[in-house]
Design a protein with these regions (language model features):
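Conserved ATP-binding subdomain of kinase catalytic cores across diverse folds
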Residues: 1-131, 157, 161
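Active-site oxyanion-binding pockets that recognize sulfate/phosphate
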Residues: 81-84, 138-142
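AlphaC helix of the protein kinase catalytic domain
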Residues: 129-140
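Conserved kinase catalytic-core segment
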Residues: 142-165
Length: 165
């Protein structure tokens, strides 16, 4: 596998040692399994605005804050500088939310840092060390489903208390 340029920068800086494999690619980012020392982690490489494919971008980014009035004006006018600032604000908001949720006790992957537009975090695995399945791929009996629902609702309450949902 050819190492993506964004991850090569992290290898060059000593943040990660090796890219093991791609894990998932979605509308906003591609996630790779990486090795950092003895630890296996994942690296979320955010796609540039031109590469993202989701339709409701305006609603998705609604309410994002930027640093100053110059940035806000540039974003409002959709200048090249403004689009770059909007992109930076979006990526920073995603990373900040992960740290905020973690600090509030929400079960999220442990973040290990944000470097050059790449979020490095813990890889969530099952008991055998394989990447954890997506929720839609898990089969639960009714009792397990009720138990997981109760856990999920407690997590949602914590997110509400943070003001993120």
């Amino acid at each position: 596998m050819k190492t993506p340029a964004a991850l090569q920068a992290l290898i060059d800086d000593g943040v990660i040692d090796e890219v093991l494999r791609p894990l998932k690619s979605g509308k906003e980012a591609a996630v790779y399994v990486v090795r950092s020392g003895d630890d296996i982690r994942c690296a979320k490489v955010y796609k540039d605005m031109a590469q993202r494919s989701f339709q409701q971008r305006v609603q998705y980014q609604e309410g994002r804050k930027v640093r100053g009035s110059r940035e806000a004006r540039a974003i409002g006018k959709a200048t090249k500088y403004g689009r770059k600032q909007q992109e930076t604000a979006w990526k920073n908001a995603e990373v900040d939310a992960l740290y905020l949720l973690r600090d509030a006790g929400v079960r999220v992957p442990e973040p290990h840092g944000y470097y050059h537009g790449v979020l490095v975090m813990a890889l969530v695995t099952d008991a055998d060390g394989f990447s954890a399945p997506r929720l839609g791929e898990v089969e639960l009996d009714p009792d397990q489903a009720r138990d997981f629902h109760a856990v999920l609702m407690r997590q949602v309450v914590r997110m509400l208390c943070c003001g993120l949902i």
